[in-house]
Curated annotation (Swiss-Prot):
Gene name as annotated: yutC
Record has Lipoprotein as a keyword: yes
Top-level lineage group: Bacteria
Basic and acidic residues: compositionally biased ranges: 196-210
Gene Ontology cellular component annotations, sorted alphabetically: plasma membrane
Compartments, as annotated in UniProt: Cell membrane
Signal peptide (residue range): 1-17
Entry keywords, A to Z: Cell membrane, Lipoprotein, Membrane, Palmitate, Signal
Keyword Lipoprotein applies: yes
PROSITE patterns: PROKAR_LIPOPROTEIN
Protein name (Swiss-Prot/TrEMBL): Uncharacterized lipoprotein YutC
């Protein structure tokens, strides 16, 4: 009889423990499911791991489709000033580059640099690829190793995509910049500036419509 009572007590304890573990596991699953529907930001992690090695920390963010379907989300906007800063700072660190100025618009990056390179084509390709590595893929990159174009690019810095006749005004500068080496073609279907035939056709139509 005593053995039976002891066995019942042990069985009750095991069932209680399993029940508690089961509830804990279920709660963990619910928590994981809820967390998966929230964006994950690097800043959410323990800051102690990133306090002394900020430049070494990877960046990671995850979104799920329903987050944008179910509620109004603000469309991410690229900081053009910061992007221009990144391009210029990276460019000036390339071999034979002494000065670099960058203008980033809503669809292109204009990079003017001063160089003492004897291989202008190679340097142009390096500058172009550096800029392309920072901006969105659909952007076009125009470069020039003529320092005189720096002032033209700087003059546009106080303007914006909504400025009057900005496309027509900038097209002249872009055409002048393209007289400098532009590097190798981006792909079989794109020229050195990342323009396709369709892009160039649209540009011609825009000019004819003005």
């Amino acid at each position: 009889m005593k053995r039976t009572a002891v066995s019942l007590c042990l069985l009750t304890g095991l069932l209680s423990g399993c029940g508690g573990a089961g509830l804990d596991n279920a709660q963990n699953v619910r928590n994981q499911t809820q967390n998966q529907t929230k964006p994950i930001h690097v800043s959410d992690r323990n800051e102690a791991f990133n306090r002394h090695n900020e430049n070494e920390q990877f960046g990671y963010v995850r979104y799920q489709k329903e987050q944008f379907d179910g509620e109004q989300q603000k469309t991410p906007v690229m900081n053009r000033e910061e992007t221009a800063h990144m391009i210029s700072s990276l460019t000036v660190q390339l071999p034979h580059i002494q000065d670099a100025a960058t203008l980033v618009t809503d669809r292109e990056a204009l990079v003017v640099y001063k160089t003492d390179s004897k291989n202008r084509e190679l340097t142009a390709d390096q500058v172009k690829k550096t800029a392309a590595s920072v901006i969105p893929r659909y952007y076009h990159v125009y470069i020039s190793d003529n320092p005189n174009h720096m002032q033209s690019v700087e003059n546009y810095s106080n303007l914006g995509s909504g400025s009057r006749d900005i496309r027509e005004i900038m097209s002249g500068t872009i055409q002048e910049m393209k007289t400098s080496p532009q590097g190798s073609p981006v792909s079989e279907n794109e020229n050195a500036n990342g323009e396709t035939r369709q892009d160039m056709k649209i540009d011609r139509n825009d000019k004819n419509a003005r």
